[in-house]
Structure formats: structure tokens, C-alpha cells
Amino acid sequence: MTGFEMGVIRYDALFGSAILRPATEELVRAETQAALAVRPAWAWLAERDGEPLGLVHVLPPERSRWITGMTRAGVTVYLQTMFVRSGERGAGVGAALVRHLHAVLDARGVDTVLLHYAQLNPLSSPFWNRMGYRPLWTGWEVRPAASLG
């Protein structure tokens, strides 16, 4: 799972929407271990013949409180990671993961799934639109902050 999480960060860094720092992988590994210890599971892996193809990971409602104020819906989760290996993109793996995620979340009584996506990533916006997601807000930033003044 750490490899997939790092894959998202590395890919997003190509478009300027993530920054790789020396401690990034260590922090991601610790977060991954904590996520895998949660029961019931809130992360799902797609695989073929034992080979991992993709991952979807949401933060459970109690860990999604920081973003629940962005909507008036009831039980809310935050979709933290969605990643499919480059050779499998466009083959329906991501869509299958999201459909599975929605089915599980419906059964668990989740009302809303919120996520951030990399707008500069040419694959991200069309994918989430196809999955039925729509923007609620837009954020802007400048890097480095020193360039502001």
C-alpha cells in the first residue's frame, strides 16, 4: 500500500500538485501501517493473479471530521488515495475499485465521499467526473510562498 500511496505523490509531483520531501516515504509508511490496522478495513486493493493493480483508500468517518464541514450531508468519509498502475490505466481497474468502494460505503451508511484531486493531472478530472463526482470548491496556492512578495 505504501508503494501505491507514493505512486500517487510521485505522479502528482510531475504536475506540481505534490512536493516530495526527504521524509515523505517514511511518513507515508507510518500512515499506511496505521490505516491497515483499522478494522473494518477502509482500503481495498485490486489484483490479478496475486499482482496488485490499484488501490482505493478512504479515511473512516471519525478520521474525516476535518473536512465534514464542507458539506451538509450526514456521515462523510474522505477518499485519501486512488491509484492504478500506469500499465493498467484505462482498463477499468479504477472504475471497478470506485464502484466497489461505493457499494461498501452504502452498506456502511456513508452519505458522502469527499476528495481532493490533482487538477493539473490530465487523467484525474475526467476520471472523477465519469465516476459521478462534481467540484464543491476550488483552492489556489503558489509555491514557494516567498514568490508572493
Regions found by a protein language model. Give the residues of each.
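A short helix-loop-beta-strand connector motif used in the catalytic cores of GNAT acetyltransferases and
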Residues: A30-W44, Y78
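Conserved acetyl-CoA binding element of GNAT-fold acetyltransferases
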Residues: L59, I67-S86, E141
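Conserved beta-strand-loop-alpha-helix junction that forms the acyl-donor binding cleft
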Residues: L114-S124, E141-A146
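Conserved GNAT acetyl-CoA-binding A-motif
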Residues: L105-Y117
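Conserved active-site alpha-helix within GNAT-family acetyltransferase domains
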Residues: A95, Q119-W137
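Conserved beta-hairpin
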Residues: P40-V56
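Conserved GNAT-fold acetyl-CoA-binding loop/helix
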Residues: R10-E31
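Conserved acetyl-CoA-binding loop-helix of GNAT-fold acetyltransferases
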Residues: T81-V84, G90-A107, R130
